[in-house]
Amino acid sequence: MGAYTTAPCDLEMGPEERTVVLIEKKSSTGWMWKVSVALLIAALCFAGVLLFAWYWNGKPEILIHSGQSEALTKKDHAEKTDPHSTLKRISSKAKAAIHLEGSYDEDEGLKDQVEWKNGQGQAFAQGGFRLVDNKIVIPHTGLYFVYSQASFRVSCSDGDEEGAGRHLTPLSHRISRYSESMGSDVSLMSAVRSACQNTAQEDSYSDGRGWYNTIYLGAVFQLNRGDKLETETNQLSELETDEGKTFFGVFAL
């Protein structure tokens, strides 16, 4: 938009001959506004290009991290729901701990109880714990978490006399403590479960070859140095001794 000013005239010529000349003064705001708009458009375009490049370059990395996070989440969930892995992880961090794997062969070794193995599979002992005569020896007086699991697979065929007899024989698993101060064995924990149960249970299922059942024991006890812990289990011929199915352990708190 232009502005106009009046040019000076000769006063001696009189008002009749007075001439007025209008001179247009160009405004400086017009071209500055156009330059600002152009710079703004250029900046927006540049920002759009940068955003587009960042999205496509970062997308594969985001997908990779997302996949890794999902895999780790599934792995953590599996470990949390598996008592064997959870107890193994906790006990391995304790200063004094022992974790044993169970084995049974009626033709070899102990015939009337589970044979506990150290240094086999995930089994270990540290902090003074010892395995003596198939018993765990407590190294120091204090609080300890004692645990054990026994897994069974029992044939429950009604047409089999031996299988029918198992209907009447429950599964049992017990942890006993021997202390010199008491001079005798004392039961710390025990559990009894029906061998053949056609109704749904949390710790039993069938695969067509037999019923699987698990007995788990675990609690905190005040134990003395030199105390000995052992297990007692029936129906040993039905015991499942694959790695992680039958175990026995203690760790200090």
UniProtKB/Swiss-Prot annotation:
Keywords attached to this entry: Cytokine, Disulfide bond, Membrane, Signal-anchor, Transmembrane, Transmembrane helix
GO terms under cellular component: extracellular space; membrane
Annotated protein name in UniProt: Tumor necrosis factor
Top-level taxon: Eukaryota
Family under the similarity heading: Belongs to the tumor necrosis factor family.
Subunit relationships: Homotrimer.
Compartments it resides in: Membrane
A Pfam match: TNF
Cytoplasmic side: 1-34
Provenance organism: Sparus aurata
Job of this protein: Cytokine that binds to TNFRSF1A/TNFR1 and TNFRSF1B/TNFBR.
CDD domains: TNF
